[in-house]
Structures are given as C-alpha cells and as structure tokens.
From Swiss-Prot:
Residue(s) at site: Important for catalytic activity: 216
Annotated residues for binding of a purine D-ribonucleoside: 4, 162, 178-180, 202-203
Active site: 203
Keywords in alphabetical order: Glycosyltransferase, Transferase
Record-given protein name: Purine nucleoside phosphorylase DeoD-type
InterPro entries associated with the record: DeoD-type (IPR004402), Nucleoside_phosphorylase_CS (IPR018016), Nucleoside_phosphorylase_d (IPR000845), Nucleoside_phosphorylase_sf (IPR035994)
Pfam families, sorted: PNP_UDP_1
Top-level taxonomy: Bacteria, Bacillati, Bacillota, Bacilli, Bacillales
Record-level GO BP terms: purine nucleoside catabolic process
Function per UniProt: Catalyzes the reversible phosphorolytic breakdown of the N-glycosidic bond in the beta-(deoxy)ribonucleoside molecules, with the formation of the corresponding free purine bases and pentose-1-phosphate.
Sequence similarity: Belongs to the PNP/UDP phosphorylase family.
Gene3D superfamilies: Nucleoside phosphorylase domain (3.40.50.1580)
Length: 234
C-alpha cells in the first residue's frame, strides 16, 4: 500500500493503462478486461486489475495535470514495480490536418511546467516515449487500418490560459495540447521503465469542434484497443 493507492503489492499488474478520468478507468475495466476487480478507491481515483486476452493488465486513474499524474506513476513504479505504463487520454489539436477523434502517438512532449527545470536545475530535459512501445503501437494501428498521427505534443500546466501560444507551437510542428505526458515520460526515464501516451483528439483548438463529456468518458475505443494490444506485446 502506498500513500495514494490502497492496493496490496500483488494486486497491480506490471503493465498498466493510465486514463486521467477515473470513470474512464472503470469503463475500460468493465468493457475490455475479464475478471476485473477494483483495487483502489482512495480519493475516488479508481484502479482495476483484470485480464485482456489472457494477459494480466491494470488500469489506474491519474487525475489531471503534471502534479497529479506524477504522484500516481511514482507510486506505481516505486511501490508496485510497474514496468510498462501507457497513458490513454484526450488532447486538443492545433494542426489543421489533425481531426477530432484522430489517435495520436506522442513521440515527444514539450511543456511550460516547471517540473523538469526544478528537477534538472534549469536544464531543458527532453522527455520521449519508449521506442519499442511507440513502434509497436504504430504497427498495431496500421494493422487496424487506423490513420495514426505520430509526433510531438505539448503538456500544459494551465487548462484556461489567456497567454497560450498555440500558433507558435503549431509552427514548430506540435500536434496537440494535453496536460500529463511530460511528467509520465520523465518519471519513466528516472525509474528505467517503458512509457507511451496514446491520445484521442477530443476537441480542436483552432476550429472549436469538440466532443461531449459523455463521449470522452465512454468512447474512444480505438485508442484503448491500441494501448491494450501494445501492452500485451511487451
């Protein structure tokens, strides 16, 4: 048991999916996993373990933002020895050729969070996905006939930011904005683990197109299937 996760050590698999929304964790467990049991309800941040195609998999909500996901992934790696962590979340597109409901594989993540500068004493550390996970996810997407987007995302500290520089980020090739990937990749590197963010575009910052809260909670199955298939091939 850790501070924020009330599970016994053996109750969490070494491969885990990480949605921000705990209700999406519940949806994934009920829809995709066999024999799923809930191992965590601390602070309402639900966690489940079950099997997918015979492979033991866990799914844990992380909450929103760098501080929240940092707590959960640190405890998962430090207290439960989780080896493979795949974020399944949403993002806002900032490129014209990226459409709502497209699936993005985050190869790298830049950020305006001070987390890494504090960690590295002012150095601009560049967090990246694990190549094996990225390659596997891309190949699975192609097998499924998906038009996956692969590239850089931006991890924002503020959801409502009056000074956001989305146009500049877009000029530099950033595909979308979200709030957790930089922390996930940095901490996975620290602990020597594998990490990847598989993201569904829930809204388009340039056009204003968006999905509903219900859609964000209970759909986006293509992203989830890619993540699960990637996890069990490790």
């Amino acid at each position: 048991m850790s501070v924020h996760i009330g599970a016994k050590e053996h109750e969490i698999a070494d491969k885990i999916l990480l949605p921000g929304d705990p209700l999406r964790a519940k949806y994934i467990a009920e829809t995709f996993l066999e024999g799923a049991t809930c191992y965590n309800q601390v602070r309402g941040m639900l966690g489940f373990t079950g099997t997918y195609k015979g492979h033991r998999i866990s799914v844990q909500g992380t909450g929103m933002g760098v501080p929240s996901i940092s707590i959960y992934v640190t405890e998962l790696m430090q207290s439960y020895n989780v080896q493979t962590l795949i974020r399944v979340g949403t993002c806002g597109a900032i490129q014209k050729d990226v459409k709502v409901r497209d699936v993005i594989l985050a190869m790298t993540s830049s950020t305006d969070s001070q987390m890494n500068r504090m960690t590295f004493g002012g150095i601009d550390y560049a967090p990246t996905a694990n190549f094996d996970l990225l390659k596997t996810a891309y190949e699975i997407g192609k097998e499924k006939g998906l038009q996956l987007k692969v590239g850089s995302v931006f991890t924002a500290d503020m959801f409502y930011n009056e000074n956001a520089q989305f146009e500049k980020l877009a000029r530099y090739g950033v595909l979308a904005v979200e709030m957790e990937t930089t922390a996930l990749y940095t901490l996975a590197a620290k602990f020597g683990r594998k990490a990847l963010s598989v993201l569904t575009v829930s809204d388009h910052i340039l056009t204003g197109e968006e999905t509903t809260a219900e859609e964000r909670q209970t759909t986006f199955n293509e992203m989830i299937e890619v993540a699960l298939e990637t996890a069990i091939r490790q």
